[in-house]
């Protein structure tokens, strides 16, 4: 069971068990006679693994009547005081012995802890009443003042257990217990009358045998260190007994004397804290005297007992002080309680049943100091002798002390004997008090004072306080409880004084002290025994260590000897082996010498044989090498011949192929020339027919227009009055009218003047030309005659009249015209303004497409936001209304950009056509004076302009043209574009042929390549973006780099937009100052350029460049094979920094592509020579595009060579010169 539960159970049993009071009789001459007072019965139901709770019953052993009649009566208080002093002295002596080699304080603490546990487990608590006091009717009321704190740790003063155990409180239960004790003590007296040397009998109640200890604790002596201090085994008890009997008389006396001296010394130390009054002095004297007597008698009893150990009968005297018959609750070992029969004795714990107050005081000490004893080890050194006479030195295994007297001895060892000294003082005080009380006849019924010396009244009438010893601070708590407990204690003292005689009280005190002295003596015996055993063990250990060291040294010596012997043997063996080896080596050397001679002879014979074989092999090898060389040279010769034959064959094939190719080209050229001749003849016939027809129509139409114009003038004269009223409106309108001033003769027209009658014509609404009209090719493309002034096939009559036409030098009469809602009609631009208003240089110009006025800034196509105003304007060219300026000998135009020609007559016109061999003006009539620097006006009908403009289609004439501009004619295709077209389906058969006038049309150069002519203007350099034109020969304008054809751009192109300020070039193949199509890829090359992208993929453009490079370099070699590096360098000249450079791998891959009319045609032959690739270009036809430099042009070609040999990619200007 758990320790706390076991402890609580034992405490409750202790409170409920009636005590057996042993009354010590007169002790004289070493005799102690005890008288049984009461038997006790205690039952316990719990056991412990190491100790058992005992159930004490009356065993029928009754003490004999007192026979020592001569023993004087001893004062109880003095006896108690002396006992306390002796206990203190014994404690001091015990401490001194411990310091000198005795058991350590730890052993003592463990001892005390185990004693307390055994005391609590014996069930002695049942011998107490409810208030822990004895019955005053049966026992002496000698109580310790410290009894009140006996159970302060576990029980309250109300008699209830803190652990739930109820304590009986009725008086009837106390009476019943006392009756039981009386009956049992009488029966015990009759059974044990022969015990004791003087006929005194003792009732021995032995401790129950404890449970079997663990196997580790039952080993024989000397097995382990624990067995030295193990007092629970039978062998150990026998050894202690033998040790005591082996001691001499002097040694035994010394042990007892040490006890007495220690107790006296301790008592003296404690007395110096008490008061020096007479009462206290008498008390100290009584204690010392009592202690002297007690220890002397105790030793005498021990000596007598030791002398009778060999006999079989009872001892000559009473057992040791712990065996006091029925009063001590003793029981022989063979009379164990029935509950615990068969158990082994406890481990030497003496717990005696005493009802005296000293017992309770001792138990109170253990209840208070229970927490301080937890650190005790299980190596308990004490072994208390047994209570039976034949087993005295078994150290009290059959002795049960239930009053706690042994705890007083432990207290002496633990706390300097404070409890024991106070107990002795109480004995002395009560003895003295009872002597006085006998005289005063119990005058004071409540006589009693606190026994702890804190405050006590005396008969001499003074009250004094005794401060507690300074070292006893730990007991301050229990003093408070003692004061409360004294009130109960005094009541019972009065009752007990009546029930016990003075002699019994004295004997009880003696018995108590003797028990204490026996406990201390046993401690000393155990200490001496332990010292002896320790010394023996130490000696034995030393001997064993010495034996071990000696054995080790012997082993080492033997090992060294053996090692030496082994070394000697090894040396012997090595010497023998060396000799044997030397002998064998000599024999082996002789054998090897003979073998070497034989081997040398064999080797020489083999060497000679090998040398002979080697010579034979070398001869054979040389013959083989000569044969191989001969065969190799033969093979090389055959290969060379084969290569020569193959080369000759290839050369013949190439020559045959070249001849065939040239024949084919010649046949093709002849066929083309014949075809062109036929076409030219047909065109001439058609043009002649058309001219005649147009001349007739023009005459009819001119007459009709003249009549209509006259009618309109008359009608306008009639409305002059109405117009006069609107003067302000007339002024603004007159400003827009273009007068016809007289022109100076210095600005005569280069055309032959022809007088044409001016036919008035009514103004009609201007009708813009739609896209369908632009594609209508049914209209006449060229005038039927160069003198023709009007077009017979006019779709809509043009409203603008060039003004009055008359003979030279005459100014026609200006009639006021009828104000027509169309303010932008060209008829108004040809009229003069009112007098005094300066004429605008753009007054005679026709309106721009989209509503822009001539001379006003207009945004070019693609610049800025579409259909919005431009960010900044570009001034319209001054002469953009007129025909291109004809520059003889290709010189610089007379009017450079920026010239101020505001003084030019407004009606002065320029010839519509240039001299023979030069391109004509733009079909929209907007060619400028700077048209020299533009591209050829070989453009298809514009998509953005309308047919609001008019111009004359008359040819050159020897006569001087009149200053007034010619009559309006329908807008037709320029003659330079009409020539050479092959779209006979859309053209009229009456187209005129201007070939003779232009030294042959350049458009005929493309007639040999029929697939390229698909579509309108596919070969026109200025017809659409992306077609290459001829590079100009003039310095580049605006600081543009000539090496980059893409930068040669204009602010306006000539397709779908008005011309740039400088006009277009009138020379063939020139781009002029911004003339022609813009070929730049960037957006900031010029003002108003459109975003331009390549119209063909890179592979097509690169192949075209390769074709051009081969054409340019084909005369640099004789056989026509060109190095690839030369071709790359030639192409690099036309590559801009913005283009990706052409790699050799890409060039070879493109040469493998099949030629067609779009990528240049022809085929490339590739070969590898000396690790480098060479390319030979074979053209499909002798097209004029790839004609060699200096070759004669086509029939009617305006220039030699027909076309530039430098071809650029689509959309780019030609590369190289013109």
From Swiss-Prot:
Q: For this UniProt record, give its keywords in alphabetical order, as a comma-separated list.
A: Coiled coil, Cytoplasm, Stress response
Q: Carries keyword Repressor?
A: no
Query: Biased-composition ranges for Acidic residues?
Result: 124-149, 354-382, 470-501
Residue ranges of region Disordered?
Answer: 1-237, 306-391, 431-508, 544-745, 765-810, 911-1010, 1018-1037, 1190-1218
Q: Where is the composition biased (Basic and acidic residues)?
A: 107-123, 224-237, 431-440, 544-715
Give the source's domain of life in one word: Eukaryota
Q: Does the keyword Cytoplasm apply?
A: yes
CDD domains, A to Z: ATP-synt_Fo_b
- Biased amino acid composition, Pro residues: 313-322, 799-810
Q: Where is the composition biased (Basic residues)?
A: 75-85, 174-183
Polar residues bias locations? 1-26, 51-72, 159-171, 769-796, 940-963
Q: Where is the composition biased (Low complexity)?
A: 34-50, 86-95, 206-216, 716-730
Q: What does this protein do?
A: May act as a negative regulator of salt tolerance.
Q: Which family does it belong to?
A: Belongs to the NST1 family.
For this entry, the protein name equals Stress response protein nst1
Q: Which gene encodes it?
A: nst1
